[in-house]
């Protein structure tokens, strides 16, 4: 792949309302938390000497009305699943969000996921979801979707973040962007190899057809063609 070509990545954040998805995105883009801009934002950086343009999409509160459209999910390259460490319901809802993504065709073997537990800065006694519970969920999800998949699924990485203390926000985004980037490269190479194989197969088929056509022509016609050519 041309290192000078800009690679576009679409990263979406999903999770229950109020877990801090918008604030996480604003911190990543270094935007004031009071900024009411919704939709998506773009950030550019370099991964392995490749220029990458990352588009991050926010649900903008639509999840409250179960109204996320297919356009929100369309062509996403990576997913950040979010919950709040002080909200058990948001953790339990992760399965529903994962199923929602799969409903739109974004299977774990096609699109990388990471898990983010936000509000980690809260005093420990307010934590109802600990690190082990989150990591166990990640392991279970991998085993659950490994069935019927012909390749090893990547581990789902878990990050504990804080928008107040700026803990692990950049690390989480760099992680999912790198996974999405590497996955996109693999897909591009796979398509290129498939196209090359198809072209080679088509060429072989064309050659075989030409040989078959030649062999099926009666001898006298071959001779006539040769004489016609020679005596033109």
Curated annotation (Swiss-Prot):
Cellular component annotations (GO), alphabetically ordered: endomembrane system; plasma membrane
Entry binding sites for GTP: 15-22, 58-62, 118-121
Location (main, coarse): membrane
Any Pfam family the entry gives: Ras
Disulfide pairings: none
TM ranges: none
Membrane topology type: Lipid-anchor
Localisation per UniProt entry: Cell membrane
Gene3D superfamilies reported for this sequence: P-loop containing nucleotide triphosphate hydrolases
Gene Ontology terms for molecular function: GTP binding; GTPase activity
Keywords: Cell membrane, GTP-binding, Lipoprotein, Membrane, Nucleotide-binding, Prenylation
Superkingdom: Eukaryota
Database matches in PROSITE patterns: RAB
BP-aspect Gene Ontology terms: endocytosis; intracellular protein transport
Entry keyword Lipoprotein: yes
Motif (Effector region) on chain: 35-40
Keyword Repressor included in the entry's annotation: no
Lipid positions (S-geranylgeranyl cysteine): 229-230
Family: Belongs to the small GTPase superfamily. Rab family.
Name this polypeptide is given: Ras-related protein RabP
Gene: rabP
């Amino acid at each position: 792949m041309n290192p000078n070509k800009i690679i576009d990545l679409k990263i979406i954040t999903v999770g229950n309302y109020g877990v801090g998805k918008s604030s996480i995105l604003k911190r990543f883009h270094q935007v004031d938390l009071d900024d009411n801009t919704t939709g998506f934002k773009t950030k550019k950086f370099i991964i392995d000497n490749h220029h990458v343009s990352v588009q991050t999409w926010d649900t903008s509160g639509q999840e409250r009305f179960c109204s996320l459209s297919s356009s929100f999910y369309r062509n996403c390259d990576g997913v950040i699943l979010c919950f709040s460490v002080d909200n058990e319901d948001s953790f339990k809802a992760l399965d529903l969000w994962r199923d929602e993504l799969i409903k739109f065709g974004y299977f774990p073997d096609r699109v990388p996921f990471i898990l983010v537990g936000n509000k980690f800065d809260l005093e420990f006694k307010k934590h109802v979801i600990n690190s082990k519970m989150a990591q166990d969920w990640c392991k279970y999800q991998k085993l659950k979707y490994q069935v019927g998949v012909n390749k090893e699924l990547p581990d789902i990485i878990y990050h504990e973040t804080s928008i107040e203390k700026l803990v692990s926000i950049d690390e989480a985004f760099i992680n999912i962007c790198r996974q999405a980037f590497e996955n996109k490269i693999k897909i591009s190479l796979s398509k290129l190899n498939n196209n090359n194989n198809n072209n080679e197969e088509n060429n072989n088929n064309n050659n075989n057809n030409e040989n078959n056509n030649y062999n099926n022509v009666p001898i006298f016609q071959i001779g006539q063609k040769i004489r016609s050519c020679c005596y033109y």
